[in-house]
Amino acid sequence: MIRQLNSPGGGGGLGLNNPRAQQPPGAQQQQQPQQAQQQFYDDEPYQANASQFRFGAGKSMEQRRETGNLIPIAQRSMGSTSTPFGSAPTQSYFGGGSSGAALSSPRKMQQTHQMLFGNIQPPRGSPPSDGSDKIHRFGESPTPGGVGGVFGTELDDLIIDELMGMEDDQRMRPGATRPMTIGGEKTMSMARPIPGASSRAGSGHSGSPITIPNAMSNNFRQVVSSSAPTSSIDIEKMIGAVSNGGGNSGGDNDPEDYYRDRRKKDIHNMIERRRRYNINDRIKELGQMLPKNTSEDMKLNKGTILKASCDYIRVLQKDREQAMKTQQQQKSLESTAHKYADRVKELEEMLARQGVQVPPSHLPPIPKVIERPIKQEIDESPPNHTPTGSFVSSSGFLSEVTNNTAAMQITSPNDSRPNNFMNNSAPSDSFFSVGSASPPDYRTSSGTASWKLPGSNAFSDLMMDDLNPMMNGDPLISSAGAHPSPHFHSSQMSPDIHWDASGFSPDPINTQQSNSGHYHMDFS
């Protein structure tokens, strides 16, 4: 015999919906099967409280109601049944029979039910439940001394373990949802149901289709960040959180936690962007500090700027090392020079104590870059003394300075000071003066030939007379005429002036002597 336990469309519990249950008590006394029933409470969908009941002989329907402490259950406002497996109406059948199975469930639960309950077929013509007297909640169970009590306890433990295992699997895979068909047309999700206290739409269960759009819109408002691009939103994760929890605020897929993680990523990206801008600014500043010849030839990007900076720093390091070496050498030379100077003073003091005349100390001669004769200044001497020149003497530093100064005074074409090149002669500003009453005195002009130095024949083309533009025109002009009066200062540098030798040699003897003194010079 088959007893049918049906959860009608208006309630969530299990009740009696078998036509044979409405028979008189006399007919029911002949039917004494043992059955076990599992009751699921609406306010605690994750826990199952199974109660066992036994239809004994000689008991009426009213007695069984009193024994089972039956409590009527109100119908759902939405008109749909919510079970631990979903929100669609589900039928459960307990008992022993030989007909085919009509129950559809997940693969794991289907295998468990087939192993425990066998194949159960509900009757086709069973009328639906229409009264609250046939919808009962079994809160108390009789003593589990019989066979039915032991079987119900084991069934309770197995079903609770299966439900908790499915819940853990669903938590591990938040985005994987599988549709489960019931009756071939209706679908429902494998997501675990959420208590009605956390529902935002006021429904008894958050798995209701009415609450899903609101939850999705709220999650969209919470998840999307103003600084994050649209592609960075994990849509699959968000939909999985909505399908699993809807309005759950304390689960693993909490939108607030996701928003917090997204905000942390945004702050991290902002810090990295600021650091990158700082590095780019420093590289640009470094490129501006490079030498122009280094930065003009190459394309200024980050790599070339850093490479050129490294090369330039190496060059600066080498220069610094070289400068330090030079400074150390200079210090060592200075210390050595001080030691030598102290030693020389000691030796001079020793010679002075011995009565030896100490020669005057002279500085070493200045090295000559170009060895060539230098014209000397005419010394003041008696009229009959012919001024002569000499080579630079190495006898002392004072003589060198005197000779160099004399040479500079002689060869300077811009010297406007009045110089007397010959003794007892007119001043230099009276030479070639316009309107002069008497010609200049050439009594010592014969000595001009003796100004030529002894070794000047071999270096006639290197004489400093070539530096004077007035001497390039005529070899008969003496060196005394190289410095005319300041009246001709502006005209002596003019290239249009051509000097004539006949106008400057009134005395034939002096002219002959001058010619004899300059016969070896070639001014071509």
Curated annotation (Swiss-Prot):
Primary localization: nucleus
Residue stretches making up the bHLH domain: 263-316
Top-level taxon: Eukaryota
Region (Disordered): 1-150, 170-214, 240-265
Record's keyword terms, sorted: Coiled coil, Cytoplasm, DNA-binding, Nucleus, Transcription, Transcription regulation
Expression sites by tissue: Expressed in the intestine and at lower levels in other tissues, including the spermatheca and the vulva. Expressed in cholinergic motor neurons.
GO MF annotation: an example: DNA-binding transcription factor activity, RNA polymerase II-specific
Role description: Transcription factor which regulates the expression of genes involved in lipid metabolism and autophagy in response to nutrient availability, bacterial pore-forming toxins or heat shock. Binds to the E-box motif 5'-CACGTG-3'. Under fasting conditions, binds to the promoter and activates the expression of lipase genes lipl-2, lipl-3 and lipl-5, and to a lesser extent, lipl-1, thereby regulating lipolysis. Involved in modulating longevity in response to TOR signaling, dietary restriction, germline signaling, heat shock and the insulin-like signaling pathway.
Family of the protein in this entry: Belongs to the MiT/TFE family.
Oligomeric form and interacting partners: Homodimer.
Descriptive protein name: Helix-loop-helix protein 30
Provenance organism: Caenorhabditis elegans
UniProt lineage: Eukaryota, Metazoa, Ecdysozoa, Nematoda, Chromadorea
